[in-house]
Amino acid sequence: GGSVNVKYLVSTDCSDDSFDWTEGWNGKAQFLVAYQSLKDELGYDCDCLMECDNNGKSFGATPVACPTLANLTLIGNGESKQGIRLRAGTKAKIYNAIVKGKGQCLTTETTETENALMDGSSELQYITLATNISCKEGIYSSNEFTKDGNHNIINYSVMFTNGYVGTIEGGKNLSDDSFFTQAAYQGAVPASNDWTQGWTLKSGIAEETIEELKGEITTSKTLTEGKTYYLTGEYKVKNGATLKIEPGVTIIAKHDDIVDYILVEQGSKIDA
């Protein structure tokens, strides 16, 4: 619920839904990436890329969820689940999106949700799907989705680089709203501006190696800023050695039957 707004969000390898809203959310979002690695790599079939509800117990409960989202790249890993799943009375305004990797890239459910798509209180425009759509109630349809003016495409093969980098020309310009950045293309991450670089990694790309501190040191050693170390049993700083601990170091004593401690002998130093 609520009206929280968000930009530049990456969700990777969630076993449940990558993005999920419910209970009246009416905020705004732009530049969202959901990426699910191949099932053979993960060992499981991820759930929906985006599960979108108003209220599961009372579909028409107010305030009705109706967020505005733009520039989405949603890449799934299983034929058995949905991409964008609109249901439980939700409304939505979704623009400039690419969805692939699911057997049903878009599904609509419940009378309230499909009626909103027909009467214009919900909008789906400039959306490219790698597969078709499914409309449970039969009120909305793939013909409505692809009709002139919506600029939507179904059953279209989409290729990306580095997992999710790439866009499709043509999109809705929402910059009249001060929240939205002008980005009249479909997708979240253009090749000319990969904003995910430098602060995100897909699961399994870089796993931190945690060094154990045990035994003894006879020469100087530095524990490096930003790293984590496991203290395992006795760790002796011998005569003539210096143990330097930089700011931002994390030292974890393992929870087991062994007593963990650092012993600084006479004639040695600790610099922290």
Please describe what each predicted stretch is:
Residues 1-272:
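Extracellular beta-rich repeat passengers
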